[in-house]
């Protein structure tokens, strides 16, 4: 079998790390339904698009055409492959990433022509995280130039009669060739009347806040008839997690999902993709990804990434633009280790402003957590990426207090909007009723998600870790005064702790303005200067701004690095 090789050049860059602080470890979610399946592969039938079948089909069309027609002048010996079905064997994570970063073809971590006898309600099959680079499969045009470092093998040569080097050939002739090719391989595999159907389905994932499966919007779904590799259809799920292809098919198809887009890639390890392989079925594919499944992490990472890139810009957030796809690795663990200044450290989330090479992830996330925690962690790290990408040189001069407080704001605002849009806001936060002057008033209880439990503690450990992960920018947006809560509505903090709890009556209306303040400030002195200007536009007095800022002004050593 002919062999070809592929190589992609790598870029050398430097490593720098920033990890999130875990203020609260959320409890493990309750058991949720689990779907697994393992099945043996079957041999596919003949492919009508294979070069051998197509040459016979072209000759047959010519033999049954008028002597003066164009169809009669084209012989099978004249046609050359337009596509190749290939297997890649990357040897390093740099080579593996290069295949996923390019946009000329789509790679899958399973053979595209393999028939799986799994029923639609048995779920999906995937390889799972790997320590060695996976083999990848793809169908690509013969015009794609492949450098020669990644080993690749041509598994099948294909011909599409509707494609020429100059554009589209005669569509009537192409249709005749396709029909003849199908007739040549019709060996009785489909006895009786074949009823066309439209591939469709829905994709959902378990969420701990909902206590149920919720839809995932924007996921790319691919269908591939295993015996017709040139007929690949793709679509994306809608807001209800549903998908429906635009064309009908007759034969069973292979379904697949990809968490990758033109903006990001999501992997389950440095050298294994997180894509899902579905069953070979003749009908719909309805997927429910359970919370204890290894793929629930990448699914939740996708939810957060999709919201940041596709929903939040309309509300004022700027999505990160690194000049290439953002690479996200989802670790199947509650935490992961990394090295910084010669020390082994642990984290649940990490953004690398400058990566070591084109093989390293930009963002790492520990995904064996509750969905809401993973979602917030991803939102935090993408917030770091957006902050850095907006102005890398300025960001390099910005201290940790501003960076982490901004990332806490993106964690907050993405979580708020996600669960509001899902109709689950009442489950995200608890409320408590009070009865002042015989009028019931409902107050949202401070919690992990609204970040209103934060205060500048006096203990050394809390002061060195928690203090930089503040709700400084959250307090500019929300309508909650945590000082009044702990001092009046629900007393319980000591006077010292209450004095170090923000007294916040500021409420600015736009996310864009808060981003402008954060991205335009290198330290707290610059931040309060901008805050005074912006808050004054809304009529807030100097006294109100001073009360809001009093606790934040007490933060010292605002660029403290506890890892040195």
Question: What are these model-derived regions, one by one?
Answer:
Residues 297-368:
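Auxiliary, metal-adjacent structural segments of Zn-dependent hydrolase domains
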Residues 397-460:
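Post-HExxH zinc-binding segment in Zn-dependent metallohydrolases
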Residues 362-378, 396-398:
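Short pre-active-site segment immediately N-terminal to the catalytic Zn-binding motif
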Residues 225-242:
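Short, acidic Ser/Thr/Gly-rich low-complexity loop/linker segments typical of extracellular
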Residues 42, 51-82, 90-100, 453-564:
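Pan-zinc metallopeptidase signature
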Residues 51, 61-64, 199, 204-228:
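Short, ordered, surface-exposed loop/turn motifs in non-cytosolic proteins
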Residues 376-392, 404-408, 412:
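Active-site recognition of the HExxH zinc-binding catalytic motif
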Residues 16-17:
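C-terminal motif of bacterial Sec signal peptides marking the signal peptidase cleavage site
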